[in-house]
Amino acid sequence: MVNALLPLVCLVAAAAPPRYAVEVNRPGPDGMNVLFDSVHHPETTDFAINNGPSHVLLLDGTDALVIRSCVHRHGCSTPGNPDVITLVKRTAKGPIDLSNLQGQFEKNSLDKIIVRPQGADEQCGVQDPRITVDRKTGRYLMAYTAFGDGTAHPNICNATACGPTWQQCSHCCKSVKTKVVMTKTPEVASSWVRVNRTGDDGFDAKSTATLVRDTPPHFQWTGTGTVRSWQSEDLFHWTAAEVAIAGRPGSFDPGYCEAGAPPVQLADGNYFGTYDTIISGAKRHGWAAGWVVLNGSNPREVLQRGSEPLVEPTRPWELQTPPQWNWTQAVQEGGVPMIGATNGLMPLGGDVFLAWACASDSVVEAFVVRVTKW
């Protein structure tokens, strides 16, 4: 008999990744979740078109939105009526009143403009801002889409020459790319400085959401059609692109995907993010949004992706239902049902967020999103 201690070997199954459930509700009376509606509530905005909102918690503890805005309804995103970016603050303090969101924000007035087009490659607009803050340095970073054509001759691409509609100006408005501005005083328009960034091919494609971390690397998600992730040690040079979010044939998002909001951290350390998409199916179509949970240790890893849309167009302001909503930008663009530009996530506490988006490219919307870990 061998009197020896044999090693005890235990086989332990690898832990399954956490799973999350996401619940979405529309705040406001009867789900009327619209803000900055220039037609039905002109007292809330000086701009005919208000869309593409992004959220930031200012360093003084005030919630703020940056909004893509056009002064006139017709010919938005042309040299004569380009998109600008405004910043409006929440005036109320304490817990947010979900039944009266509009009443807690400043008017989106002309004096709230913080970024205007500069140069031929922005002559048609500065669009779809996504803002975040580096709390270690006190520096705000805002990525936006520059829309124009840097090669166009100024004699044929100006407010007088190219006409009042986008169709007449299409030859002047055909290039898009991400640019970034930074400041330590976000309400002061003159303080925003365009920064020079470099990177591997495609780092400055249209639509960029940035995750600034206390310790590098930092990350960004960029692109339309397919979203890729990038990393940086200093927020100025971006490398090592990887596919992050691509279309899923057979799912609600079979093809087009576009970067959404800067990710927000969940209680367990992972991140929650959004993306825009074009849904398709027998009973649904149009612009909508999806969601992902990213690994807190490696935000480039998608731990879970929603099997159903986060939000999809079902209400009159998203379907352009006449006569109340047939004035919107989306009608001019062909009348496609639309919830787009889910560019902001506002933490409410306890893994509950306000997701900011726009309806029909014309008004701001908000949705309450509750994330639950299994």
Map each language-model feature to its residues.
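Beta-rich carbohydrate-recognition and catalytic domains
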Residues: 16-124, 133-255, 265-335, 348-374
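ATP/pyrophosphate-binding catalytic subdomain of soluble kinases
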Residues: 258
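Cleavable N-terminal signal peptides of Sec/SRP-targeted secreted and luminal proteins
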Residues: 1-15
